[in-house]
Amino acid sequence: MLIRRLALHQLRRFSAVDLSPQPGLNLLTGDNGAGKTSVLEALHLMAYGRSFRGRVRDGLVRQGQEALEIFVEWDEQRADHPPHRRKAGLRHSGQDWKGRLDGEDVAQLGNLCAALAVVTFEPGSHALVSGGGEPRRRFLDWGLFHVEPDFLSLWRRYSRALKQRNALLKQGGPSRMLDTWDHELAEAGEPLTSRRQHYLERLQQRTVALAASLAPQLGIQGLELSPGWRRHELPLADALLLARERDRQAGYTSVGPHRADWSVDFHSIPGRDALSRGQAKLTALACLLAQAEDYAEQRGEWPVIALDDLASELDRTHQARVLERLLNGPAQIFITATETPAALLDLTHIARFHVEHAQIVAVP
């Protein structure tokens, strides 16, 4: 996956900018607050439907404007398809949105996000390891969404059934109607959990190997899924039935894949609560790069790699290890920094851009 053009309109500080990235490494430098991160935000928004710094309506649209617009043009280079050029556009006001993909309107934002794959490491990425379960569930589902074409329909089926069951619980609905939605939840939730389990097992080997290469002191030994109910003891249908009275009192469904989580097992660190912020960042980075490598193997092309403020997030040793691994592969990489990171000072084959006064200028 190779981005050829990125155009931003009315996004944070930018009125209108047009960027032509190059294959390999693209370095964006500039002072703090110049807008470097906004470029990566735009890519992330196109790939995930949201910014990694909050909701669109929370400051992503330039002050005084109605909506932001993003246009991306890229070459898709999958092993099972001939190379071809793709185009996507998004107009987002924070409330309403309109998207186009390859000249056609898209009805669901997920269809737009399915086209462009971006793996992002940014200052908040440590939450993947040290935060609550929601970002870890999103991590699993994003990977499955991109490598298993029917996963999205399965996920939507489960989400729809969960919404209906929760509504019945709040309304005090009859047991026969709850029976119907319990059955639907189990029919979608069991295979959804099996997909997550198999995917995490696949990532485990890569994550352990990556961590041993990038940060051996972490001693990462494996990844473990908590499915959201005692799956080793009983099927989801039984778990839902057993929890029904408790769920009636609470007004929501307390068991199932929506309560799932996963954890990293360490050799000598007792758990995520004992991690320093730096250890959490390195662990998250190992997981994210493992996901990118798995995507590349399954799809036959690399996702775009976006590394925000790398020099502030990692020390020189770990910067060098990460960049050495990435630069030995075919991925297109975007890095932001206030100045050229030490690990890149001796490299010549880099596309350099400077961000200043709401403009992006290519540096010869």
Curated annotation (Swiss-Prot):
It holds the Pfam family SMC_N. GO terms for biological process: DNA replication; DNA synthesis involved in DNA repair; double-strand break repair; SOS response. ATP binds at residues 30-37. InterPro entries: DNA-binding_RecF (IPR001238), DNA-binding_RecF_CS (IPR018078), P-loop_NTPase (IPR027417), RecF/RecN/SMC_N (IPR003395), RecF_2 (IPR042174). Coiled coil: none annotated. SUPFAM superfamilies: P-loop containing nucleoside triphosphate hydrolases (SSF52540). GO terms for cellular component: cytoplasm. One of its GO terms (molecular function) is ATP binding. It is found in: Cytoplasm. Keywords: ATP-binding, Cytoplasm, DNA damage, DNA repair, DNA replication, DNA-binding, Nucleotide-binding, SOS response. HAMAP family: RecF. The RecF protein is involved in DNA metabolism; it is required for DNA replication and normal SOS inducibility. RecF binds preferentially to single-stranded, linear DNA. It also seems to bind ATP. NCBIfam families: recf (TIGR00611). Belongs to the RecF family. This is DNA replication and repair protein RecF. The gene is recF.
